[in-house]
A protein has these predicted regions:
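Signature aromatic-anchored transmembrane alpha helix within multi-pass, membrane-resident enzymes
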Residues: 190-195, 296-315
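Membrane-embedded alpha-helical segments of multi-pass membrane proteins
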Residues: 2-13, 31, 35, 92-96, ...
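Transmembrane-helix signature of polytopic, membrane-embedded enzymes
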Residues: 24, 102-122
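Membrane-embedded helix bundles of polyisoprenyl
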Residues: 113-131, 135-142
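Loop-to-helix entry region of an early transmembrane alpha helix in multi-pass inner-membrane enzymes
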Residues: 70, 82-96
Length: 346
């Protein structure tokens, strides 16, 4: 576990330096994030889904891939053309995701608080070493929201198409972000439902494959999904308590609350609900981040404390899951393994 915690402590040190400085410092962030990037990029069989990606990318030379998303597989094919090794492809995707996430943090005035205190400790390892398709798509979503969708709608649509072609489910991020942050977009909610229903009719084989992934993985008890629900409720509390600091309309609170309860209900039926909970957590964090507009341009100490606590809870949950799955499966997070070529150097 120390392999994961020590790089995070170094990153936290950089976060504290930036907070003392009064804002995000790109040089400090990028320097102090080198250990966590190296951990993800130089790994071997570590990360729950890593083995599955290795297996799928073994056949890239024959035109095969992982999933049905065209741009994700096109990028994998590009990396394969650079160096035909499934490990290089997997770790290349991890590096791309890591750099995009950290670049977004370093280029945002308030990135050090929302990205540094919540995103990195709570989700960095998950996005770069496990759910890699969604990880890359969520990094693209973070780039898309740097500029408000209503200011440059064409730009946002282009990013949305790219993100969706990297991971189909990430379309929900782009649609729901507009629905939750812009007044008068209630019809967007109906649009989301129509799009999802339409895709399910046009692409039944894709949804059938997604469903089969979770066969036999039904949630064992009421505690399944409880951590994500707690994080979502804490974020919702922050939205409401500090509502004058965030440009989020009440309809946004309502949508998040309804989705949080509904997705928790799904986790009691199937493990797939937990993956959708991750999408909602990501959405709510970006809502807080991009819609933060304090009148005096300063981060309130009490709000920063809330974010720190949310990040610690998310990190504690990640550590618990890693420990619980230690030694299980083909590529668990624990014990951490470096790439074979690095192991040979030792």
């Amino acid at each position: 576990m120390s392999y994961y915690l020590l790089p995070l402590l170094i990153f936290y040190f950089g976060v504290m330096l930036c907070i003392a400085y009064g804002g995000t410092n790109p040089a400090v962030i990028l320097t102090c994030s080198l250990p966590i990037v190296a951990l993800a990029v130089l790994r071997g069989h570590s990360g729950t889904d890593t083995a599955a990606y290795y297996q799928a990318f073994t056949d890239l030379g024959q035109g095969n891939g992982y999933g049905a998303e065209p741009l994700f597989n096109a990028y994998a094919q590009f990396l394969w053309a650079v160096y035909p090794d499934p490990r290089f492809v997997v770790n290349g995707i991890s590096m791309t995701t890591a750099l995009l996430l950290l670049w977004s943090i370093s280029r945002s005035r308030y990135g050090i608080w929302f990205g540094g205190l919540v995103l990195v400790p709570g989700m960095f390892y998950e996005l770069t070493m496990n759910v890699m398709r969604f990880g890359l798509a969520s990094a693209i979503f973070l780039l898309a929201t740097r500029i408000a969708p209503h200011r440059k709608p064409v730009r946002y649509v282009i990013y949305a198409l790219i993100g969706t072609c990297v991971h189909f489910s990430s379309a929900l991020l782009f649609l729901l972000f507009v629905a939750t942050t812009r007044r008068g977009h209630t019809l967007m909610i109906v649009g989301v439902a129509i799009v999802v229903i339409g895709i399910s009719l046009v692409m039944p084989d894709y949804f059938s494959d997604k469903t089969s992934l979770y066969t036999g993985m039904a949630a064992p008890n009421a505690s399944s999904g409880l951590l994500f629900l707690l994080i979502q409720l804490l974020m919702l509390t922050v939205m409401i308590v500090y509502r004058r600091q965030f440009a989020i309309p009440p309809i946004g609170w309502l949508i998040c609350a309804v989705l949080a309860v509904a997705l928790y209900g799904i986790t009691q039926v199937t493990y797939a609900g937990i993956r959708f909970q991750l999408i909602l957590v990501n959405l709510m964090l970006v809502m807080l981040w991009r819609q933060f507009s304090p009148r005096n341009r300063h981060m309130p100490a009490s709000l920063a404390t809330w974010l720190f606590i949310i990040g610690l809870i998310a990190l504690a949950g990640r550590i618990h899951n890693m420990s619980d799955e230690e030694g299980k499966g083909e590529s668990p997070f624990l014990p951490y393994q470096t790439a074979p070529a690095i192991q040979e150097l030792g």
